[in-house]
Amino acid sequence: MNDRFIGIDFGLSKVGLSISDPLKIISIPLKVIKYKNRKELLKKLQEIALENDVKSFVVGYPLNMNNKKNEMTKLVDDFFVELKNLNFNVFLQDERLSSESAKKIMREQNIKTGNNKEHIDLIASTIILQSFLDKGVIDE
């Protein structure tokens, strides 16, 4: 199967999305989605999944550096369940330092990070998905 994966950098009002190539080797930036409520976000993700032959999502999991959960982790836990309930395969990927890595990449390319939050989310989602793919993925 050549089903693709979508990586998600989850936020309260927007998410950064990346997509795998059909062979699940490389993560490619896709888009940032702004949303007003979870129902709207889930609908948009379903549409994108259908358009791109996606059956699986990889969601960044925001643990603290000491491996403890925080408020955002609890929101991602709920989001994980909602995506699963839509009959997608959903995986969690440690996202610690993904935003910092995204900022570093942007600075190395002389891209300003200050007012470029969407670009940071997009690169962070790409880092999250690439980290997952690098671990080796079983064809679902």
Over which residues does each language-model region extend?
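Conserved catalytic-loop position in the HRD/HxD motif
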Residues: 9
